Structures are given as structure tokens and as C-alpha cells.
Amino acid sequence: MKTSHLIRITLPGALAAALLASQVSQAADLVPPPGYYAAVGERKGSAGSCPSVPPPYTGSLVFTSKYEGSDSARATLNAKAEKAFRSQIKDITDMERGATKLVTQYMRSGRDGDLVCALNWMSAWARAGALQSDDFNHTGKSMRKWALGSLSGAYMRLKFSSSRPLSAHAGQSREIEDWFARLGTQVVRDWSNLPLKKINNHSYWAAWSVMSTAVVTNRRDLFDWAVSEFKVAANQVDEQGFLPNELKRRQRALAYHNYALPPLAMIAAFAQVNGVDLRQENHGALQRLAERVMNGVDDEETFEEKTGEDQDMTDLKVDNKYAWLEPYCALYRCAPKMLEAKKDREPFNSFRLGGEVTRVFSREGGS
């Protein structure tokens, strides 16, 4: 009798198994790549004094564009406008850079003072409701998503470290994560439902900030949105590996193709460890884009032919602009030439990706 009962409930075996797998996948906690579980370094010396928290930015997010007055290519900087922009966003960038630096110092040295300082900085901004203004322009909502990616990416190292540094700071952790969740929800509103002609690297960076926030706050809805935005991006990559909306940047087209890669590679790496393989989206679009960029760095002629402009290589001479190579080469078996390019530029440290990218994707870090 028991046997027949078992047979009856297992008759639709394949369907039942598929449904069960789907339910388990949906129920599973979101996780980062393995390197984020790295233990805190052994304590070395004592922490210095905690710098003053940058004033929480609670004002309007209407900022001057550094390209103000430029034509539709948005490729020529306006020095006067850029100076105004840098002044307007100083507290935000000080917060991004400073908090990321404090987390990095703590993870390296294990000095409790650095941890306490980093958490005090973030909780101060959380309690103030910083960066939540509904009054914003394109530049302002761009700053919101960049800051969220920087701060949640750095905080993630504390959240998932096997040393459990946040265990004694439950109240502050809850404040900070609730703030990240509010910002993540706002970033989704800011960057949803754009026409394809308006979707470019900004949307990709927004998706990275939401992916990072999704993992920190275990929000499956945010994770799904980030994945959907990646798919839009992947389907913008043409057969030759170009992004048409970045080709519009003319002399900065190659630089902006490269700038599109860090958020996309990070999203793909985070999706992969959560059971979503994005590598084959649009017939391997991410790989086509990466190879097009690295070929362009070696010889920009193809970009010059596409845009009719000599390429501005200034940004491409900065090693950290290639931080995307770490998550990318964790996803793909990188060719020797690409591995050599990565090795020549390491270690990568990008505050917009949460700090020490090489460390969290290195074999020593656990990946």
C-alpha cells in the first residue's frame, strides 16, 4: 500500500522536480562570490582616529552636468561646469571614498576602530535619510546609484566575512541595510522603463548598485530587476561587440565601452553564484563586448572607423579602469593575452565596485 502511494505522488516526476527546484531557487538566500567570505586580517596595530563623517547629503539631487553645453555626443568636458559639479557632489564622493577606505583598512588589519568608524559613517547617513530626495535630475539620480553601489559593495565584505564582524553591531547593521533597501527601491524607480535609445552605461551602473543591494538585503525582487537590466544591456551589444549608444560618444566611444564593462561583469558574476548563468545572453554578448574593448585598447582603429574620430585614450591609461577583468576572468576562461593584461594592471581597487576587486575575486580570497 505504501508503495502504491509513493508511485501515485511521484507520477508527474519531471514536472514536480522542476517545480521543487524552482521553489528552492526562489527560497534560497542571495549570496556573493566566494571571495566575499574572506576572514578579516589579523589585527595589526591600533586604528587611527576616526575622521569626521561627511555631512549626510539630504538636499536636492539636482546637479550641474560636467558636460553642460556639450553637443548630443556628451563627449566634451566643460571645465567650468565640471568644477561646479565636483563642488556640489563633494560630500557624496567623500563618503563613497572614505567609507570604502575604512572597510578596506579593517579587512586588511582587523583594527576594530576602523570597523566602528565605517559603521558610524554609514549609520549616520542612514539615519539622516541621505540621498533619498525626490527632487533630482539625470546627474543627481546618477550620483544616487553610484553612491549606493560603492557603499553597499564595501559593506558586503563586512556582511559576509567568515569573521562575522557585524555580529556585535546588529542595530547599526539593520539601520544601514534598511537604508540601502530604500535607496535600491528608488534606483529601480529612477532607471526603469527608459526607451532603448536612453539606456546606456548609466543604466548598467544602476543595475550593479541594485544587484549589490539585493545581495546585502536578500531582496529577490531587486536581484531580478538587475538581471533583467543586464539582459537589456546584453541585447544592445551588436554582432561585432559594439554598443550603439556608446558609439555616440564619438572620441570617447572606446572609453565608454570599457566603462560599461565593470557593472556588467559584476552583475554576471553575482548572478552566476545565485544560479543564473548570463554568459550566453544574446549569443555571448558580454564576451563579444570584452574582446572588442581589449582589441580596441591594442588598436583603436576599429573605433575610429566606427565613429570617424580619433579616440581619447586618457582614461584607458588608468589601470583601475580595467577592474572588470577580475569578475570577467572568474566567469570565463580568459585567453593568455587577456590574463597578461589583467596581471600587468593588478591589483585592482575601485571604490565604485566596493574597494578591493582583486582581493574578492582572487583564488586566495576564496573564489
Curated annotation (Swiss-Prot):
Reaction catalysed by this enzyme: Eliminative cleavage of alginate to give oligosaccharides with 4-deoxy-alpha-L-erythro-hex-4-enuronosyl groups at their non-reducing ends and beta-D-mannuronate at their reducing end
EC number: 4.2.2.3
Molecular function per GO: poly(beta-D-mannuronate) lyase activity
InterPro entries to which the protein is assigned, alphabetical: Alginate_lyase (IPR022859), Alginate_lyase_dom (IPR008397), Chondroitin_lyas (IPR008929)
Subcellular locations according to the entry: Periplasm
Binding-site positions, substrate: S65, K66, H138, T139, Y256
GO cellular component terms given for this protein: periplasmic space
Region forming the signal peptide: 1-27
GO biological process, one term: alginic acid catabolic process
Keywords assigned by UniProt, alphabetized: Lyase, Periplasm, Signal
Origin: domain of life: Bacteria
Entry-linked NCBIfam families: PRK00325.1-2
Purpose: Catalyzes the depolymerization of alginate by cleaving the beta-1,4 glycosidic bond between two adjacent sugar residues via a beta-elimination mechanism. May serve to degrade mislocalized alginate that is trapped in the periplasmic space.
Family statement drawn from the similarity comment of this UniProt entry: Belongs to the polysaccharide lyase 5 family.
Protein name listed in UniProt: Alginate lyase
